[in-house]
Amino acid sequence: MDLLFDFFSLDFVYYPVSWIMWVWYKLFAAMLGPSNFFAWALSVMFLVFTLRALLYKPFVRQIRTTRQMQELQPQIKALQKKYGKDRQRMALEMQKLQREHGFNPILGCLPMLAQIPVFLGLYHVLRSFNRTTGGFGQPHLSVVQNRLTGNYVFTPTDVGHFLDANLFGAPIGAFMTQRTGLDAFTYFSRPAVIAVGLPVMILAGVATYFNSRASVARQSPEAAANPQTAMMNKLALYVFPLGVVVGGPFLPLAIILYWFANNIWTFGQQHYVFGMIEKEDEAKKQEAIQRRAANAPAPGAKPKRNLKAGAGNGVDADAAQPDAGATEGQAGGGSDAPSRTPRPGARPKKRKR
């Protein structure tokens, strides 16, 4: 393995990316063969899955932050209307609002920002399998020298297996419009590269569109009405998917597979996380309803008397004592004058004329 670490480069990105890809490659190569096209393709795809699994919690925070941002839209609009001309006061009020609700907009960007260096690192590692073309940051090697040179954690033998891997003559490290460095591959057929890359490229664009569509569909009406949000929605729905299709011919097949796998994972994870959050919100609503129902009085029940208030003023207790004495007098029959207080439930006596 070529482990010459350069602290003044992006090796801190290149080595982890190549190591994760190398682990998955060795696993699939043991089952499919070291020069198998699908062993290398699956290693790239599972590199994506590993990264996205590590970013699962930040992704959930991103979704919660996005939903919280939508809930705060009415208050943000009110601040914009009130302090629209005073940018400094507007910024202070926005920070105050974010602190009150525990809102951190940086968390919403973390998963996206974390994927950028990984994408650049993977692109560089894949380019480094074929160093016969030279270019920015790449040595210009001969075909023989290239096969005898390792690629970060990949050995020279692994480099040879990568250059040999192809599907119907389409090397996994080649791209449709490639004109140089073709001698490094054992087999190269441009029609085969187009035939393999075009369907994956279209699927990656379609997956990008459906991901964007799912995100836009879950936006609140207030957020969708925002002009900036509306513009970003149009870019996400139409420009980004089209960019994948247009840029596909200039990217290696492995990068197109990376983009396709990333969008497939995002689509599934997005639906799972949104469903989980909706269930949590529904459970909170049901808990609140049950709490209110438990505290509410039963239908037809009389309100409870405040015994403390009665004991404090002594009125009810004093008023109840004569009645109790009169009742006892009636029961004993020893009172001088019969009580005129009717017994509870007794019918009133008719007065004789």
From Swiss-Prot:
Q: Which UniProt keywords apply?
A: Cell membrane, Chaperone, Membrane, Protein transport, Transmembrane, Transmembrane helix, Transport
| Residue ranges with Low complexity bias | 291-301
Membrane disposition: Multi-pass membrane protein
Stored Pfam families? 60KD_IMP
Residues passing through the membrane, by range:
3-23, 28-48, 106-126, 191-211, 237-257
Q: Which GO terms describe its molecular function?
A: membrane insertase activity
Could you tell me which residues belong to the region Disordered? 285-353
Domain of life from the UniProt record: Bacteria
Please state where this protein is localized: Cell membrane
User: What GO biological process terms are annotated to this protein in UniProt?
Assistant: protein insertion into membrane; protein transport
Q: How does it assemble?
A: Interacts with the Sec translocase complex via SecD. Specifically interacts with transmembrane segments of nascent integral membrane proteins during membrane integration.
Give the record's family classification. Belongs to the OXA1/ALB3/YidC family. Type 1 subfamily.
- Tell me the protein's name: Membrane protein insertase YidC
